[in-house]
Structures are given as C-alpha cells and as structure tokens.
C-alpha cells in the first residue's frame, strides 16, 4: 500500500490499524527549535478520543501518545519526530461475521478488489481510528504555525441537516459537538438520541478557519493552496465534499456580488475564502467539509459475500452515531499539515528581496 505520506517538505507518514497493536507516525522536515512535548500532542488527541460524547462509540481508548524521537529538552531537534499510541480496547470478536461479508458504505469490497486481502477487524487501515495519527501530526504542525502567528480552528456548522448560527466561534471548542451556537446543542443532542434509538447515523458539515496566514502561500498551477487543502480534507474517509469560501453558493451569485473589493486595509469581503489564484491573499482561509453518516448502522442491510452471493448483514460492535464531533480536530489537523508544508515551501522558494 502506498499513499501513506502527506506533504513535500513538512511530511507526515502514518501507520497502524484499528485493531492492531497501535498507531503512529513520523514527521519529517520539522525545523529545529520548535517548542514541543507529549502534552502538546495529547491535548489534540483528547479532542478526538472515543467515548467522550453522546454521538461517540463506547470504545474506551486512552490514546496516550509517546514521543520516540526528534525532541530533546522540550524542543524539536530537526530530526524525524516519531510518535506512537497503543490500542488497548479492541474487541475483534465483534467482527467475525464480516470476515466473509462486505459492509455497505465501508471499504471492505474495494480493499478486497485492490489487495485480495483485508483486515476486517474494525476496518483495519480504512477505519476512522487511522485519523489519530493525523491529529498527532497536525499538533506538531500547529506548533510550527504558531511560531509564525498562524492559528487553525474548526467547528460544526450543521448536524443532521440542522444548522448552527455562528454566535460564538471562539467558545466552540468548549461545547458539545464543537458547536459555535449554544442554543442548538440541545436540539443536536435530542436528534442523536432519536437516531441512535432507530439504529441509524448522522452526517453534518464542519467549517475550518485559518487566521494569520500571510499572502503568498500556494504553488500554481497544480499545487494551488485550495487544491491541496481540498485533497487533504478529502483524504479523510468520511469527507464527501469540500467548499472554499462561498463555495457552491458562488455558482448562484453574480460576479459583482462574488468579487471581494480590495481596500487599503485588505479585502472588504471574503467570498474567496482567503485564496485567489491558488495563493493565499492574507485573509482568513475558510473551508467547509461535508461529512457523510457513519456507515455502520444497527439495521439489517443487503449485501454480498466474498463469493458474490446475496446475503443479509447486521453489524455488531461499538460505533459512532456520527463522525462529528470527533472528525472536527481531524480536519483542523489536516489543514495545519498543509499550511505548515506550504509555509516551508514558500520560505525555500521565495524570491530574495533586494
């Protein structure tokens, strides 16, 4: 299997499966002298840890990270940064039936078609648990970005078709579902309970914002900043669509409305989402990701077995009702990883000033 590395100069390579011994990764290309310790990474991992909310699986994983290399006396050394997290609450017996059956909405069929073999325990490498390594790597990227005044935040703007108002984005991280709207939380909680009782699941929309990004990041033509960000977000298994700025709403606007007037202090509006011509323009980068419902539902489903014979399937095991809120720090991490890479590329390739 290839495709386990993201980035050119700031590179994350990940490893591990849902029910294997553990998961982890290696960051290569991080400059020396960045303040970093296990606590910095742990704070981000705790935001996506299972069992922490009403929509989450009951699987209890402490997700304690160990830094194996690349950090000395609280700062990065410029060498590869390796980290590892052990799996401790696997229950592989729940997955015995799907060794021969394909779960609708999962990667079981396509992994078999590609590799001829698959780790059926919890989805193996295709499990959402794989994103743990992304969050750990993203925490390191955020430490680098912070030195340059760049911050990334993410929050839920819609769950199960019920939107949130952007009332208090700053406080979203402290609320259930990372909601920017205190008044919508109860409705979301009620909906999760109802859908869970029906044996079903929910999707939603997550918004990611990056502030302090200087103008000039992005490498046209094929490495446009928005293209690489969309690539990174779409690499997360549950994401089925990405918008930048006004996104699909721009298709319903006139040019006179969509254009962002330029004033001495910057841009008067931000329909472009902070990116023009694939290059950051100094405004806040605004992204939205459409998150599909979790495919593991507590209902009988129609499928086939490995021999192509029709079958019925009822999925056991412990599963999220929604990828939200646990996917929120994942999307923040992916955005940070791309920005860290683009920042280093810009520093290397920038034209010297006279």
UniProtKB/Swiss-Prot annotation:
Binding site for NADP(+): 48
PROSITE patterns xref list: CHORISMATE_SYNTHASE_1, CHORISMATE_SYNTHASE_2
Free-text remark on how the cofactor is bound: Reduced FMN (FMNH(2)).
Pfam family, one: Chorismate_synt
Enzyme class: lyase
Involved pathway(s): Metabolic intermediate biosynthesis; chorismate biosynthesis; chorismate from D-erythrose 4-phosphate and phosphoenolpyruvate: step 7/7
An example molecular function term from Gene Ontology annotations: FMN binding
Biological-process GO terms, alphabetical: amino acid biosynthetic process; aromatic amino acid family biosynthetic process; chorismate biosynthetic process
The keyword NADP is annotated on this UniProt entry: yes
UniProt keyword list: Amino-acid biosynthesis, Aromatic amino acid biosynthesis, FAD, Flavoprotein, FMN, Lyase, NADP
Gene3D superfamilies: Chorismate synthase AroC
Enzyme nomenclature, EC number: 4.2.3.5
Catalytic activity: 5-O-(1-carboxyvinyl)-3-phosphoshikimate = chorismate + phosphate
KW NADP (keyword) present: yes
Assembly and interaction partners: Homotetramer.
Cited function: This reaction introduces a second double bond into the aromatic ring system.
Family statement: Belongs to the chorismate synthase family.
Identification of the protein by name: Chorismate synthase
The organism of origin for this protein: Nitratidesulfovibrio vulgaris (strain DP4) (Desulfovibrio vulgaris)
């Amino acid at each position: 299997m290839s495709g386990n590395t993201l980035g050119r100069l700031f590179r994350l390579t990940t490893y591990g499966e849902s029910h294997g011994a553990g998961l982890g990764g290696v960051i290569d290309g991080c400059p020396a002298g960045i303040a970093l310790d296990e606590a910095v990474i742990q704070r981000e991992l705790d935001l996506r840890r299972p069992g922490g909310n009403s929509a989450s699986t009951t699987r209890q994983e402490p997700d304690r990270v160990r830094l194996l290399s690349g950090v000395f006396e609280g700062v990065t050394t410029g060498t590869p940064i390796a980290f590892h997290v052990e799996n401790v609450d696997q229950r592989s017996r729940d997955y015995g039936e799907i060794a021969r059956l394909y779960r609708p909405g999962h990667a079981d069929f396509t992994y078999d078609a590609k590799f001829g073999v698959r780790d059926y325990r919890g989805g193996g490498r295709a499990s959402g648990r794989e994103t743990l390594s992304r969050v750990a790597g993203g925490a390191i990227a955020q430490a680098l970005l912070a030195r340059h005044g760049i911050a990334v935040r993410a929050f839920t703007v819609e769950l199960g078709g019920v939107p949130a108002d952007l009332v208090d984005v700053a406080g979203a991280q402290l609320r259930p579902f990372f909601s920017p709207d205190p008044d919508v939380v109860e409705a979301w909680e009620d909906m999760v309970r109802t859908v869970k009782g029906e044996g079903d699941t929910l999707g939603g929309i997550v918004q990611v914002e990056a502030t302090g990004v200087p103008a000039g990041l992005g490498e046209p033509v094929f490495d446009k900043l928005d293209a690489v960000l969309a690539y990174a977000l779409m690499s997360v298994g549950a994401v089925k669509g990405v918008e930048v700025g006004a996104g699909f709403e721009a298709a319903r606007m006139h040019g006179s409305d969509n254009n962002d007037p330029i004033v001495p202090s910057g841009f008067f509006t931000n329909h472009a989402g902070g990116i023009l011509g694939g290059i950051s323009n100094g405004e806040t980068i605004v992204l939205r990701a459409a998150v599909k419902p979790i495919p593991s539902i507590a209902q009988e489903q129609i499928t086939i077995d490995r021999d192509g014979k029709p079958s019925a399937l009822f999925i056991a095991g412990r599963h999220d009702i929604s990828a939200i809120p646990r996917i929120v720090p994942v999307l923040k991490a992916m955005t940070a990883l791309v920005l860290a890479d683009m920042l280093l590329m810009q520093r290397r390739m920038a034209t010297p000033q006279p």
